[in-house]
Regions:
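Bacterial N-terminal signal peptides
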Residues: 11-20
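Bacterial N-terminal signal peptides that target proteins for export
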Residues: 1-9
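Substrate-binding/charge-relay-adjacent region of secreted/lumenal peptidase catalytic domains
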Residues: 62-163
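Sec/Tat signal peptide C-region and signal peptidase I cleavage site
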Residues: 23-25
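N-terminal zymogen propeptides
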Residues: 27-86, 363-367
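Predominantly the structural core of cysteine protease catalytic domains
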Residues: 29-38, 98, 104, 108-112, ...
C-alpha cells in the first residue's frame, strides 16, 4: 500500500545478533469537603504513572479528546449512592491471572476491554470483543513469568502498537511455554493496530473532593448528558496485598450488605498488585475503631481534624484477578479511607484511559529472526527518490528496539530469541507506517 500517490523507497535497517533476517513489505449521600481540600488534578507519581524515559514534560493525556481531570464540574448532587460497572455487558468475565500479569489484567483485560466495547457499541461476551492481558505483558516481562508490570506498560503498548483481540491472539494463562512468546503472524499485529489508547491519566485520591471526582468518573465521567443514560468509566488501582487477613473484615449482621467482605486498609506488607475499581457504594461501612459506630464525622485517628482518613462509611467496588470465586464473586469493597494510607504511595492514586480506533494508512510486514532480541535494533526509513542513499523520514518500532520507552531492553523484552525463549525461528510481524 503506497504512502502517497508518488512512489516511495522503503528501507529497513537491522542491527543486532541476527541468526537470519528476511522481510517482506506488504500491504451515598453527598459528601462534605475536608477543612483543607485538594481538588482532583493530574499527577505523575514515580515510578508507576508514566515512563521515565519520556521526561518530565510528557503529558500522558495528550491525544485524548475528552476533558482532562479538573476540567469538568463535579456536582455530587447528581450521583447515586451505588454504581457497579462490572454488571454492564461491556465488562468482561473475571478470571484468575497466571504469573505476574496483574498489571495487564487491570489495564488491558479489564479496563481496555470495557472501554473499547463501549466505543464500538459491542459487549464483552466473546473472545472477539475481549482483549488479552498477555500481549502487552509479554512485551515487558523479560520472558519471566514472575515479573510484573505497570498499568502504563499496557497503555503505552496500546498507544504505540495496539492490542489484538483474544480471538486472534489467544491467552497465555498457565502455559509456561508461552511466557515471553511474541505474536507470530502479520494478521495479529495488523488487527492490534486498530485498537488503541488515546491517552491515560493518574490522579491522587487523598481528599473527599478527589474521591467525589472519582465517583463522578465511575458514574458518568463527570459529563452528564441530558436525555442519555449515564455511562461511567473504570479506574486502575495498585494495592499492597501482603497479610490481607489483617485488613479484611466481614460486614456484621444487621448492617448494610451484611456478610460482604471489605478491606479497611491496604495490606501491611508485600508488593504492589494491580486491581480494577469498577464502582462505589456510599453506604458500605465498617466500625474500624470499634466504638460501636460507623461514622464519617469523628476524628478516629486522633490527628485533631476530620478528613477522608477518618471515614468509616463509603467504599470502592474492586475487581481482583484471583478468580470468580475469590471473596465470593471475585470482588471486594475497599473503604475510601484506605486511599489515604501514607505507607503505600501507589495506593493513593487512580488511573484512567480514553481509547480510540485507528486505521493505518500503510503497513509493513516483516519476517526476521534474532537470537537475542534485547540487542536487536531496527530502523525503517522512507525516501521519495528510489535512488536515495538517506531516508527522509525514519521510524524505530519500539518492539524491535528493546522497548526503549520502558528502560533497559533486557529488563523488558528479555535476553531471548525474537520469537521467544528457545525459538530462533523467524517471526512475522506488522508495523504501522502511518507515523512516517
Amino acid at each position: 500500500m503506497p504512502l502517497t500517490a508518488r512512489p516511495w523507497l522503503i528501507a529497513v535497517l537491522l542491527v543486532g545478533l541476527l541468526a537470519s533476517s528476511r522481510f517482506i513489505s506488504a500491504a451515598s449521600s453527598p459528601t462534605s469537603a475536608d477543612k483543607v481540600e485538594e481538588r482532583a488534578q493530574a499527577a505523575y507519581p514515580k515510578p508507576f504513572s508514566r515512563p521515565n524515559s519520556m521526561g518530565e514534560d510528557y503529558n500522558t493525556w495528550r491525544g485524548a479528546t475528552g476533558p482532562d481531570v479538573g476540567q469538568t464540574v463535579v456536582d455530587i448532587r447528581r450521583l447515586p449512592s451505588r454504581v457497579d460497572n462490572s454488571t454492564r455487558p461491556q465488562f468482561p468475565p473475571i478470571y484468575k491471572q497466571k504469573g505476574g500479569a496483574c498489571g495487564q489484567f487491570t489495564s488491558i483485560a479489564s479496563i481496555f476491554t470495557y472501554e473499547m466495547n463501549l466505543l464500538n457499541g459491542t459487549v464483552a461476551s466473546t473472545d472477539a470483543t475481549r482483549f488479552p492481558a498477555d500481549f502487552s505483558w509479554n512485551m515487558c516481562n523479560a520472558a519471566n513469568s514472575a515479573q510484573g508490570s505497570e498499568a502504563y506498560h499496557g497503555w503505552e503498548t496500546a498507544k504505540h502498537v495496539g492490542i489484538p483481540t483474544v480471538k486472534t491472539y489467544g491467552r497465555v494463562e498457565a502455559d509456561k511455554d508461552l511466557i515471553g512468546k511474541w505474536a507470530n503472524g502479520y494478521p495479529i499485529w495488523r488487527e492490534a493496530m486498530e485498537y488503541r489508547v488515546a491517552g491515560y491519566r493518574y490522579t491522587p485520591t487523598a481528599t473527599v473532593a478527589q474521591i467525589d471526582e472519582a465517583r463522578g468518573w465511575l458514574f458518568d465521567r463527570n459529563q452528564p448528558k441530558a436525555g442519555q443514560a449515564p455511562v461511567g468509566g473504570l479506574l486502575a488501582l495498585d494495592g499492597r496485598m501482603g497479610e490481607l487477613k489483617k485488613v479484611t473484615r466481614t460486614i456484621p449482621e444487621g448492617d448494610y450488605l451484611a456478610g460482604e467482605d471489605v478491606w479497611i486498609d491496604w495490606g501491611p506488607s508485600g508488593f504492589g498488585h494491580g486491581i480494577t475499581c469498577v464502582g462505589y457504594d456510599d453506604q458500605v461501612g465498617f466500625d474500624v475503631n470499634g466504638d460501636g459506630k460507623v461514622s464519617n464525622d469523628i476524628d478516629i485517628n486522633g490527628d485533631g481534624k476530620v478528613t477522608l482518613a477518618d471515614r468509616e462509611r463509603g467504599a470502592f467496588i474492586v475487581v481482583n484477578s484471583w478468580g470468580q470465586t475469590w471473596s465470593k464473586d471475585g470482588k471486594i469493597y475497599l473503604l475510601y479511607s484506605a486511599m489515604v494510607d501514607p505507607t503505600w504511595k501507589r495506593g493513593n492514586y487512580l488511573g484512567r484511559i480514553e481509547v480510540s480506533r485507528h486505521i493505518p494508512r500503510s503497513t509493513l510486514k516483516l519476517k526476521l529472526a534474532c537470537n537475542k532480541r534485547s540487542d536487536l535494533r531496527v530502523t525503517i526509513g522512507i525516501a521519495g527518490d528510489k535512488d536515495a542513499t538517506k531516508a527522509e523520514h525514519e521510524l524505530a518500532p519500539q518492539p524491535l528496539n528493546g522497548w526503549p520507552l520502558f528502560g533497559k531492553p533486557k529488563n523488558n523484552v528479555g535476553e531471548v530469541p525474537l520469537a521467544g525463549p528457545g525459538d530462533e525461528s523467524p517471526l512475522e510481524i506488522g508495523i504501522d507506517l502511518t507515523p512516517l
